Amino acid sequence: MPKTVVVTHPGKPINNEKRFRFELLYFCVILLMVVGLAAGYFMWMMSFSTHSPNKGLHILDRSEWLGEPPSGKYPHLKLPVSNIIIHHTATEGCEQEDVCIYRMKTIQAFHMKSFGWVDIGYNFLVGGDGQIYVGRGWHIQGQHVNGYGAISVSIAFIGTFVNMEPPARQIEAAKRLMDEGVRLHRLQPDYHIYAHRQLSPTESPGQKLFELMQNWPRFTQDPTSLRLLSNETVKIVTRPYWLAQPPIVPLTPLKLPIESVRFVATNTPSCFTQAECTFRVRLLQNWHIESNGYKDINYNFVAAGDENIYEARGWDHSCEPPKDADELVVAFIGPSSSNKKIALELIKQGIKLGHISKNYSLIDDLEKS
């Protein structure tokens, strides 16, 4: 009987083993490529984060703080912008996100309902929690300082900083926002920083924050160039702002156009903040009325050390003897080159408005005092 021969096929298991090894190798190569790409992307992101001005900057958009939509249209900013104006909100501060959101909604409601604005007036606000809250953003003109919305971006610190400094993280967040503005080409690299008080009769952004600002690299001490851009070269603090009392009796009209301007010294201590200078001007008015028997403060304007012009009798009313009734009298609290420069700008404005003759004469009694 013939034997049955069983033929085996040793090649098949060998082929399966080779295929398994090949697939394993292929899988490992793909895995290594994915891991390599992920690692490379991670390193790139780490490098980007390290060198980006955006590192640590957290911005909450309007939808995140539940802002109301604008009630109307508003004009766009021409970018990049060259000027930053720093404010404080003159409200309570906030250290936590939920409190800052509440402050944002309150400020927006106040601006829209009390001022009649179409939206919150600031471009950005900075919370004490170290976060940025978007107001009107980079693209829309603000209503933060009258006449300057088209040529500046406003950054308001949430809080009141007359007697206390903002926390370090609030200041750092504002600086990072400005760096981000340059990176995004929303700000010019050589932008200028100003305080609200340099452009308007206000304490904003508060004395303590203003003192800190003066150490910032891009802070600009002289606001003349910005005033020229806004067609405003002189900041006049009107009588209601310094809480002037009314004249005792009606004043004598000043004959226009004025042919002569006289600079005189008040011979009183200097002042360097609006609060101090307002106090000095009010003391002068009280002294002139109660001690000297004048009808009112006996100057037309007062140039003070805070680089503001304070309206006294103004353009329309003449001073009393021993002053010449036909002269415009500008008094100086602490005469200096800076407030003398502003007084000369006041004269230019007076000529432009038709109050002062183009051929006026200037009598400078400051040199005698």
Swiss-Prot record:
Q: Where in the cell is it found?
A: Membrane
Q: Which GO terms describe its cellular component?
A: plasma membrane
Domain N-acetylmuramoyl-L-alanine amidase: where?
80-206
Gene Ontology terms: biological process:
antibacterial humoral response; defense response to other organism; determination of adult lifespan; innate immune response; negative regulation of immune response; negative regulation of peptidoglycan recognition protein signaling pathway; response to bacterium
A GO molecular function held by the record: signaling receptor binding
Which sites does the entry annotate for glycosylation?
A: 231, 359
Q: Which UniProt keywords apply?
A: Disulfide bond, Glycoprotein, Immunity, Innate immunity, Membrane, Transmembrane, Transmembrane helix
Q: What does this protein do?
A: Peptidoglycan-recognition protein probably involved in innate immunity by binding to peptidoglycans (PGN) of bacteria and activating the immune response.
Q: Which family does it belong to?
A: Belongs to the N-acetylmuramoyl-L-alanine amidase 2 family.
Any idea what this protein is called? Peptidoglycan-recognition protein LF
Organism whose genome encodes this protein: Drosophila melanogaster (Fruit fly)
Q: Which gene encodes it?
A: PGRP-LF
